[in-house]
Amino acid sequence: METQNHLSCTGQTPLTNASGLKLLPQSVEPVYTNSTLTSFSQHGKVLNYDLPVNGLISPSLSNNAHGTLLSNEHITHNSASNNFDYLWKKPKSSVHKDSHVSNQFLVNGSTCPITNGPSIKRSPQETLGNCTSNQTASFNVSSHSVCSPNEANVKMVTAANGAHYGFYEASLPVSVSASNMQSVSGDNLVKERTVEENEAGATEERNHTPELAEALEPSDTQTDLNICEYKESVLDPVIQSTPNPLLPPDVSNLDDPSQLPSQLGDSHLLNEDSLEPFGADLIQDPISSTMYDLEELEVGSTKQKDPQLDTSSLDCPTYSLSAAFPLVAEDTNDSSVLFNASSASPVLGDSVMQESASEMGEDPEGSKAEEPVSGPENVSQDEMTIENTSPEPCVAAEHEEEELEPGEVKGTISRRRIATPEQVCFPLQHGWRREVRIKKGSHRWQGETWYYAPCGKRMKQFPEVIKYLSKNAGPFVRREHFSFSPRMPVGDFYEERNTAEGLQWVLLNSEEIPSRIIAITGKRGRPRNLEKAKAKEQKAKRGRGRPPKVKMIDLLSKADAKLLRKLENQDILSDSEKVQLCKLKKKMRRKARNQEAKLEAAKKLKEIKEKEEKKQKIQKAKNQEKAKNQEKKRTRRQPKQKAPVVQKPDRKLLAQQRRLEERKRQQFILEELKKPTEDMCLPDHQQLPDFPCVPGLFLPSCAFSDCLTTVEFLHSYGKVLGLDEAKDIPSLCTLQEGLFNVGDSLGEVQDLLVKLLQAAMINPGLPPYCQSLKILGEKVSEIVLSRENVSEPLRIFLEAYGGDIELCDSLRSHPFQAHAPHIKTAILAFIVNELNASSLIISEIDKTLENMSHYRKHKWIIEGKIRRLKFALSKRKSSEESQITTTEVSLRRRSERNAEENDELDSIDESAIQKDYVQEEVDIPPSTSVVELERQIEKLTKRQMFFRKKILGSSQRLRTVCLGQDRYRRCYWMLPHLGGIFIEGLPESAEPTEEAALGNDIEASSVKTEDKSFGSLCKTSGHPRNSTAEPEQNSTSCHCSDSKDKEPSGVTDQFPNSVPLTNNQQDLSQSVFLSWLTKNQTSIMDSTVLTPESSPPHSESTPIISSEATEKPEQWLPLISRTPCRNHNQGLSTHSSNRLSPPSPTAATSVKQVNEFTEEAQTFATSLPSNSTPCHVCYNSGKSSTASHEITLTSNILHDSEKEKRRGRRPSKLLKQIEQKYYNQLIERPIPAGVRQKWWWIKDPAMLESLLKALHPRGIREKTLHKHLTKHLQHLKEMCARPASDALFKFTPVDGHRVSQETLDRWSVTDLTFQVDLSALQWVEDLEQRVMLSDLQQRGWSPSAPDSVRTDLKYYEHQLEPADDITVKVKREDCRLYRESSNPLDLAVLRILCLEENVERKYLKEPLWLFSEVQHEKVVITNPEDPLSTTEIEYSITSRLRLWRQTVERCRSAAQLSLCLQQLERSIAWERSLNKVTCLYCRKGDNDELLLLCDSCDRGCHTYCHRPRMNEIPEGDWFCPTCISLQSESEFLRSSGSSKRIRKCTVRFTEDSPSKPSRRREHPTASQFSPGESPASKKRRMGTRSQSPDLTFCEIILMELESHEDAWPFLEPVNPRLVPGYRKIIKNPMDFSTMRHKLLNGNYSRCEEFAEDAELIFSNCQLFNEDESDVGKAGLILKKFYDARWEEFSQERNQISL
């Protein structure tokens, strides 16, 4: 079995041809069945070549004179190396056909069905094809193969156990009916499969001992001989067929003969899932054999013939596959299987063949492992030679067996291929859809794969797909392109999720798919071992019967097993081979014995372990029982103990503990009442003074805030921007009127906007990505801004710096002045903020800071001198009290100085101060008197105040000072330039919680708490504390608990300060506490009970605490002692479930409702430390959850104390009122609406004093405000005393005034836009009149009637499109859009286009008309009525003029139209007007009738001043002497056949006026020409008077270079500040703008000079920049373009010169 040469034997047999029997080996006895020899009749002229096989005489084969077998005529093999080469590489002869017969020879008394020989009808490509190839085999019988008795097919079949089953098959003449000569249909395949399965099941339990057989196949013959042996079979002369149909020979296994597949008896080991991929294709493929048709005819007659016939041998894998035998290539490059099961077996159906070598070696019927008996067989000489000389293919095949391709399974039988993702994606490219549905199962994620056909049909299983493919067979999509594995990442993945609408399938994105696939796969270990897994599957799915034993041959190694099979298969063995065979068998038996011994030892060891475990369990149970018994005895022996006596609680100790808890609760309440808290939580506020609103203010709060920002900025930095403070900076009143579009104030606001925007365009300028934006060919930053056009550059500026998108879109069609006042102020504030980032402002700020440091230095020096003088003065007086006073004064002033400069207070050591004073005293002469010292101190004090004011002024210039906020979150601003204190109300959009957080962040550094708490006071005591009663009082720290400032609180001012707290001696007795309460009862009552005077105005009364506020307090109570107070807001809000009940209408709250608490916090009340409670500053008291938790905490403490039965005096009503006061401060009241969205101001110094008194010292915001007001009180009083210089504060509203609230309410953007558009239309009409009065229009044109006086005009807003932006370049010529005839803006656009077309071209100048850019174009006009009549019109135009027209067509606002109108106005040469023409000689403008105008330059000359004198006006065009001398070309002077004489007069030319040929020329009307065209006689040649044609072409090249997309680095000169080191390397810089300037000024006299400058640009670029940089790449591309254009120019110039 292990050799590959048993089929490729060639050569002559060593015996003579006359010998009837072949000599058998000596060691093998001939075996005969029935002691008979069976001979077969010879056919033709052949010798009797009888072959005894196990006692049988083989049929005679034809041989030639040399004793060799005859070969076919159409196939020859010259050498052993060429055997079966035609099966791989050479096509078979077209003459050859397989011969098929229905006869079978009687071998050993048994019948053998006829099978095909090796199929050679296929080409090598078909033979090597896939097992699923649909190769239709036909039944062809040629006359040659049927009639030739010399041709026979010899076929060898190798069983799975290593023995050879030979079936004799010869090609004999047979008559086959036409009905049988057809391909087998699918129904026949199914029938045959059923028959095979039945027979295989019947023969599965039979045991057979097959014997070895050897097949002979000479190399020079095509005749195949199959020898089949059956032990104890009966010779039956009758020809019959077997019930098992044979398969066509389509599968080859020659690559490794040892791995032949197992027989069909083991096919049931595979489950249906593994067979699924092959079923449909295998059934549908037709079979390339006609034996099935012949077998169908004989099935009925053979079922009852021989019941004892052993057909299990027919179930060998060779016949269960659709191949006769395997073949393998000799070379390693082509090692594919020759016959790869292109047709499926009808017997197998959907089954899949086994593949592993271990499975091949097993006995299919489960027979015992016995040594096979070698039968006497004839072996040719050539076969032995090939076996000895060609061992390499075996090794090659062995390596090929180990290295498999992906998707293949080990073995020679084609297994199901695992589809790759590329294959699975293939159906999706042809209309299929693949969806994987993932949902959560009971234990893990589960996936299900669905396929959707192109028609929409859904398929969930392979049979559905196969059925669909069978009905809709396509040329592309096949079964192997499908996979239902949900772990393959192909198609759409959906996950089942819970949504608001219920369970829905959600499409997963690409990032979620890998995680879902991993979840579907689950936790998997190492990769599966395929061989072990298959072995396990076979054991689990094995059929009935005794399990097969391990074969003895499997005990050997692979090499020994191969050698054993080789030796056993040989008929003749040498002595050495026999010895070797015996050794192998002994080795095999020894290993078998060893293995059995190991199994027995393992079995015995297992039994011993089981016995030991049983003994241990028994012993353990006994020990447990023994222990139980001993325990029972011990309990019986012990005497009964008496029940423990319950001790009565010590009432005194309990009472003392209760009193201690009560004092702790009181101490906690008093400490909390002293801590700063949220201003709106304090119930005892004093009413703030009523501040007057800013008079004359009608702007919204946010708008007025922006106005103040703008005015203060202009006053501080207006001079830096070049603004005049007296003229350019408007007052608040003017600014407000301008925002309301009132009279001249609107112009001032627009002028302010123009100046601010112009400054912002220069510095900081537009961002780099917006610097290339151009309007009408000019950069946006270079446009001359005005009131009319400022809206468009403003829009671009806002878009560049990320302004509001809606505002930018609004500015596209609406001007600045049409927007609401608050929008306009927001625009001004936006520009001011951007100007703050300019380098000018930053440098000014740096200078201010430097000056402040200089002033501060001088102030410190002066303060040092004052300190030394005061110290000397105090020492001179020799007064100890004065010295102490001086020390205190110096300390206070030093602290004030540090506070002014925003420095922290530092602790001062008294001894260091004394030493410092002693050192400073040395500088003062001892003879100085006291009066002199006081005078010096007074002088230095004045200088100190001077520097302090300088520092204050500088700091106010840097920033506006915010003094703080009051209880209503109103900001107090100190504005130095306006005077007074401005108060800004809370904006409507601001959230209280956000403001509270902001206030906490701002005031965290300055907010401090009240006096030290009782817990801190107790620290001064020397007595140790009981750690059990008061554990870790300082476990929680707070940044608000270390204040040194004393507050005038009525509750805490007179409280004792140092009383120790111990277990024996209490810190404060009940009587002392009650006596203190009695003394202060009046003050506490006044500050506790809520009255209309003490409660905040417009605030709601105290709400009643809900009874649900104390549920489950243990969830949050431990957090207080463990978590820092700054995190309490987060920690407590997560557990908050408390809510406040609706507010009570009464002023005071019922004590009973407050004291309804639960008992959960009783233990906490006993151990609650006084310092562990967080302060309310850290709580972010704007959130109700924190307040409710605090209420729960304190209410639980009160309830616990009141729950117990008290002894002695009951708590007084005053204490309950204090507790109620504490509860009230935990509730934050809303800010009244009356103090929002408003502005107030303080102008009276007395109002500051009342404000200071009304501020609450415990409010976190008002405390900071009080501090800052006190600090700057003197300066603030001075500011309030200043007279109000702004007219806004003196404004008195009058009915009907435009500055009113009604104007804001009635504000309409469209109405104001309509007025601006109407003014633009009037501007266009005025320009038309100017052109007519200057006589600059074409002859015969006059403007139409004014449209601005029409009454049917109305506003129309166009739809905005991105392509209509005037900054976007367009290439289309026709940009005309729909224009509304009643819209003023559209009418203005039409009129300005008409005006430009009718302005005489010679009166146009830059920027629209450059003579070097003039292009002559022609237009053909077709008459709609007469299509055959066309008119060709020539006109001139420039690129800038074309751009101007396109821009006008895209105008959507008056600002855009103003830009176009201004450029047109600049492009008209107003100085050439006939009203200003004078004579060249006499310099007078009189005698208009005799004044001639030059047709070239429009200069005039009197006829009598001309030399020679002209008596008559000449015919044709007339040119002045200057133009004649400058013009060298005669073509320019050709007469057009008409005279042109224009006199200086304002009278319009009419058709009916008397015409003189010598005076005037008839001009065609404007209607004769297309828009923008002038008469043909007015066309000028390209080129200017001062430039040659060559320089004109240079200008064209320069224009093309400037418009090139890579010309951006060379358009402007390089800025040395931005590019350091440029001037050091580049000595002669050059750029395109410099070249254009030189070209326009006439600095170029020759083209070579122009070329030198151009080359200089490129050489500088190459010298300074690297080739890989962006600038270097741009320079290389631009140089190539320039060289190409210059070459064209040179060629054209050379042609002209020739």
Curated annotation (Swiss-Prot):
The DDT domain covers which part of the protein? 701-766
Task: Extract the signal peptide range.
Answer: none
Keywords attached to this entry = Bromodomain, Chromatin regulator, Coiled coil, DNA-binding, Metal-binding, Nucleus, Repeat, Repressor, RNA-binding, Transcription, Transcription regulation, Zinc, Zinc-finger
> Molecular function (GO) terms listed?
DNA binding; histone H4K16ac reader activity; RNA binding; zinc ion binding
The answer on whether this UniProt entry bears the keyword RNA-binding reads: yes
What GO CC annotations are associated with the protein?
chromatin silencing complex; nucleolus; rDNA heterochromatin
Kindly indicate which segments of the sequence are annotated as binding DNA.
Answer: 541-553, 541-553, 1204-1216
Q: Where does this protein have compositionally biased stretches of type Basic and acidic residues?
A: 528-540, 610-632, 890-900
Q: What does this protein do?
A: Essential component of the NoRC (nucleolar remodeling complex) complex, a complex that mediates silencing of a fraction of rDNA by recruiting histone-modifying enzymes and DNA methyltransferases, leading to heterochromatin formation and transcriptional silencing. In the complex, it plays a central role by being recruited to rDNA and by targeting chromatin modifying enzymes such as HDAC1, leading to repress RNA polymerase I transcription.
By sequence similarity, the record places it as follows:
Belongs to the WAL family.
What is the name of the protein in this document? Bromodomain adjacent to zinc finger domain protein 2A
List the gene name: baz2a
